[in-house]
Design a protein with these regions (language model features):
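Structured helix-beta-strand junction loops
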Residues: 159-160, 216, 292, 332
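Glycine-centered flexibility motif
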Residues: 22, 165, 229-233, 294
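Catalytic domains of cell-wall/extracellular-matrix polysaccharide-remodeling enzymes
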Residues: 171-250, 256, 298, 307-310
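Conserved hydrophobic/aromatic pocket- or pore-lining residues that grip, position, or stack substrates
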Residues: 63, 167, 213
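Metal-dependent polysaccharide deacetylase catalytic core of the NodB/CE4 family, i.e.
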Residues: 66-70, 106, 110-204, 302
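Terminal accessory/targeting
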Residues: 1-145, 238, 245-332
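Short C-terminal domain-edge/linker segments immediately following a structured domain
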Residues: 89-94, 158-162, 197, 227-230, ...
Length: 332
């Protein structure tokens, strides 16, 4: 329904049939597939045994909307006037990156390593989506890839074998022709080919916009989740090829369904869950993915899990929730 959109041009989960019918939390296509395979086995058409519940791959993805809290002169002035004062602001501004409350990347990688040690290194990947463009107010903060701090973050990614994807700007979401330019800029700064993408604000607006991802050389897109409801937007927990609705062509572009974005769970305008409810709902989705032998894509922003100060963060338990989910995956 092209006429039903929020202020960012997104079709929301609460408007979808799966949500209204009460099965957004189920990978319904995977369930149908399992049922059909069972019938085929009963009819002796297919002899393959159904696999036991098992998550094929875990993608720990992190959108780097705001990599640092207080690393520019503007930030320093802001925190001196409105924050905790000059002394504390100066420590964040002038000290090592580890003193910045938004620099939570080492902790995130530590969680990945814990999970990899149990389930295997090939079944778990860390993926940081980094912006390289955008001038909209919704693209703030506008950070520079060539800055000393960003270069240090990119070096950290290289050292820790973290994959880097393009976090397409809000502007590029509205004008998809900009995607190629942003991708090329990120590639120049990283020195590597970039083939993964996620749209800022999860703002994948129209189906035909996927053509621009193809043209830019994107092979895998991780945008396919609703911002307002965690669950299965595509009805499946498995990666699927995009099908161009205009010519019915099966595209080489692969869409990875996003199961859980942390702010979908807690934001008052979205699901508005408390910690216990968020953990229970997330655990339910994880079990559904395992039952379907799918892949689990999680999205936690680096600035949502800060422990020292909570600027613009609605709740203080997202770090605790992420750690609990990692433990749940280790157990299962």
């Amino acid at each position: 329904k092209r006429n039903i959109r929020d202020i960012h041009g997104r079709f929301l989960g609460t408007e979808s049939l799966p949500f209204k019918a009460g099965f957004i939390h189920r990978p319904i296509v995977d369930e149908y597939g399992k049922l059909l395979r069972r019938w085929l086995r009963q009819a002796r058409v297919q002899s393959a045994v159904e696999l036991p519940p098992h998550i094929q791959k875990v993608w720990l993805t992190h959108d780097v909307d705001a990599p640092f809290f207080c690393r520019t002169f503007r930030n320093l002035i802001r925190e001196t006037v409105k924050g905790t004062g000059l002394k504390h602001a100066w420590k964040m501004f002038q000290g090592p990156l580890q003193e910045d409350p938004f620099y939570t990347f080492p902790w995130l990688v530590k969680q990945r390593n814990k999970l990899k040690a149990v389930i295997g290194k090939n079944r778990c990947e860390s993926l940081f989506f980094i912006k390289s463009g955008g001038s909209s107010v919704y693209d703030k903060p506008h950070y520079k890839l060539h800055s000393k701090d960003l270069q240090e973050l990119l070096l950290f990614c290289k050292t820790e074998k973290v994959q880097i994807g393009l976090h397409t700007s809000y502007d590029a979401g509205k004008t998809p022709a900009l995607i190629s330019t942003e991708k090329e800029l990120l590639e120049r700064q990283t020195g590597k080919s970039v083939t993964y993408n996620r749209h800022h604000y999860l703002a994948s607006r129209e189906p035909e916009d996927m053509v621009w991802l193809e043209k830019a050389g994107i092979t895998d897109d991780f945008t396919m989740g609703y911002p307002d409801v965690a669950g299965f937007r595509l009805g499946t927990s498995r990666p699927v090829h995009w099908i161009n609705p205009e010519n019915k062509r099966i595209s080489p572009l692969i869409l990875h369904p996003l199961a859980i974005m942390e702010c979908s769970l807690n934001e008052p305008v979205y699901m508005n869950l408390a910690y216990e409810g968020a953990l229970a709902y997330s655990t339910q989705l994880i079990k559904q993915v395992a039952s379907a032998n799918g892949e689990l894509v999680l999205l936690w922003h680096n600035d949502s899990i800060t422990t020292r100060i909570k600027p613009n963060v609605s709740v203080d338990w997202q770090r605790k929730l992420f750690a609990a989910i990692i433990e749940e995956l280790i157990k299962s």
